[in-house]
Amino acid sequence: MDQDYEELRAKFTKIGLNETTVKDTLKNKKLSSSLNKVIEETNVGSSGCDRTIGNLLFTLANASLKQKDPKSNAHEAFIASKIVSGDLKTNLQVNAAITYCKDKDTIDESEFDKETGVGVVLTPEQIEQLVGDYVAENKSKILEQRYQLLNPSASALRQHALLKWAPQLEVKQTLDRKFLELLGPKTEQDAAAGKKKGAKAKNSKQKTVDSGKAKEQKIVSEQSKKYNMFEEGFLAKLHKPGGNTQLIPERMKEHLQATGGGVVTRFPPEPNGYLHIGHSKAIAVNFGFARYHNGVCYLRFDDTNPEAEEERYFESIKDLVAWLGFQPYKITYSSDYFDKLYELAEELIKRDKAYVCHCTDAEIKKARGGEERGPRYACVHRDRPIEESLLEFRNMRDGKYQPKEAILRMKQDLSDGNPQMWDLIAYRVLNSPHPRTGDKWKIYPTYDFTHCLVDSFENISHSLCTTEFILSRVSYEWLCNALEVYCPAQREYGRLNVVGTLMSKRKIMKLVKEGYVHGWNDPRLYTLVALRRRGVPPGAILEFVSEVGVTTAVSNIEVARFENCVRKFLENSVPRLMFLPDPIKVTLENLDDSYREQIEIPFNPKDPSMGSRSAFLTKHIYIDRSDFREEASSDFFRLTLGQPVGLFRASHPVVAKRVVKNDEGEPIEIIAEYDASSSKKPKTFIQWVSRDKESNSPVLIAETRLFNNLFKCDNPAALKEQELAAQLNPESEVVLKNSIIEPGIYDLIKSAPWPKTDSSAGVDKAENPESVRFQAMRVGYFCLDEDTKKPNHLVLNRIVSLREDSAKNKN
């Protein structure tokens, strides 16, 4: 036992742990065993390692003990190797690695590196810029709350997509300096505010209810303010046209002459799939920024991968941009510039800034440091003569090489800590025909080569993209400057994620192929075609993007917030109809068979411009089954035997007398009276639909589709493909077959689209069924589905429920 003790003590000491930690660890048998296992997996027990690596291995061993499921430690050796190789340098990265690997059967190393910040090296200048961007975006709040926002700002930056991997002391010092530059030294008022805040915290328990109400009121107040994302935050701080400096000043003169000094942006999707809710932000940012500044925006298809592109994706993207209310200045394609890009590739070779390489993927990875993140070195082809690379590149063009036998690489800077400078691939061989150029080309440019150069060709003033491309800004500028062309300004904002939804093309494709959803436009998905079919108006999506705002931080938004934004948009902008999901017949026995009372009902009492329609109260009407109970109770204010209820807009209440039931004892008809003698106002009013042949009432609904969350879990994005089916919510789609609605629905069909908005809130086509939107009173917001076969086969989709849903069954 003593020998084992001494061996472990020697091992723990060799990895740099201090004496106290070694002693404490040896007292804990489980921790000792776990740490020894980690050391053995990395072979540092005999050779030792520096203290930083040792402490990280200790963190891993300690975390492994806390995992309840043994499977969670399946990739412990892989994480340990990443620590020893220097890929994982901080506790934050190690913890991120543990979280990433927790439920993974296999590890995608490139995805692992992205999720754990491997290779993310921020220079002091980049930290200065990112912190400065954050302070600029929040300037108004900081000026108002001053140093009270310092600590919350530091917390926010610790969650930043890139800054969280940076040295936190350096980030904090930079933030402190930025606050000092903006606010000056702390004043007595700042100190008093801090004390006041502390005093409030001590009394918080006594004020829980009041503070909760105040917080709720504040949220409501803040949501009611109209936010313009182009006047505040990230987009308001962008440079003016001409404000991005050039390596060659003459290029800026040429650019401004071509653009007239205006804003020029672009939305550059890859036509390899359907757009999702996250893309709506990119559309709104790029097209909206140009529109706000009276500039222009290109719709440019980045069609450089013919193996994944299909015509249906091109058409869908065009259609959705128009649906969101934007008109491209021009629709262009990266393939439009293939000839020009090829010429510049040859020029890059002639400038000794590119070379043809024949290395395999594995050889390239190893030369970039490999899994061990060792030293980087040039491959044997890097210094080949210019003439030789030029000849080989032309051989690639002429089809003399098969895929992966030859590539063109940019000759960048392998010593740079940024992976985007490690001789990126510019051209590769592909044998697939292109949708637009056919078999003309055997080689195709990569995104890294194409994107910045086409931005340059189109004189883009603001190349706006998400923060995943921050590191790419260096290679973007390097290539433009290497060729001495105009260099647009790339600027990055945080992407939009709607939590609880699935965005992965691969995973959605699995659901589609296996029949779990009804295609890419299934209303339970968050693709834009699905949201459109569900009935979400384009203007509501734009309002949502604007409300969330544009900053450099990733926006992780709950589905509930998105749906609330849709509700607010629809509340006063669509007509209202009486709709009964589950109708039951009511016979008013004191009325004649010929009784027909005309009642004029506005489509929306808050907006007379929507007009009105006539409803006819007759002897036979229908109410919703949920609005009737045989026995009264103190919390139920609708119709019971003994409790009258008002009919919406009708002159008098109804009084239930008795119930007719079927053989199973279920109510199938209510016998009631229309009580003209009553002068007492009912406690509540319910919707109703008459049986009236003259007005073709009621209108039968073939299907009413109610949509709920597709998955049972809160984070389906974290599921593996094989786990998706088990987590599907069996109640995600509920179909009702016997619903009815009043004939006013036909008035809405004739006068669609609803709501009536200008093009800044999107463009609905009247002939599209989803443009017929309305509020089903006390039920929710609905639209017609594309399965509708007018006029006698109507299918409804619920867009969102009403806020009152949770309380409906109580009163």
UniProtKB/Swiss-Prot annotation:
SUPFAM superfamilies: Nucleotidylyl transferase, Ribosomal protein L25-like. One of its GO terms (biological process) is cytoplasmic translation. One of its GO terms (cellular component) is cytosol. A motif ('KMSKS' region) lies at residues 502-506. Residues 207-217 have a biased composition (Basic and acidic residues). It is found in: Cytoplasm. Keywords: Aminoacyl-tRNA synthetase, ATP-binding, Cytoplasm, Ligase, Nucleotide-binding, Protein biosynthesis. L-glutamine binds at D302, Y447. Its EC number is 6.1.1.18. Residues 190-217 are annotated as: Disordered. GO terms for molecular function: ATP binding; glutamine-tRNA ligase activity. It catalyses: tRNA(Gln) + L-glutamine + ATP = L-glutaminyl-tRNA(Gln) + AMP + diphosphate. Its main location: cytoplasm. InterPro entries: aa-tRNA-synth_I_CS, Gln-tRNA-synth, Gln-tRNA-synth_Ib_RNA-bd_2, Gln-tRNA-synth_Ib_RNA-bd_N, Gln-tRNA-synth_Ib_RNA-bd_N_1, Gln-tRNA-synth_Ib_RNA-bd_N_2, Gln/Glu-tRNA_Ligase, Glu/Gln-tRNA-synth. A motif ('HIGH' region) lies at residues 269-279. Residues 194-205 have a biased composition (Basic residues). It is an enzyme of class 6 (ligase). Belongs to the class-I aminoacyl-tRNA synthetase family. This is Probable glutamine--tRNA ligase. It comes from Schizosaccharomyces pombe (strain 972 / ATCC 24843).
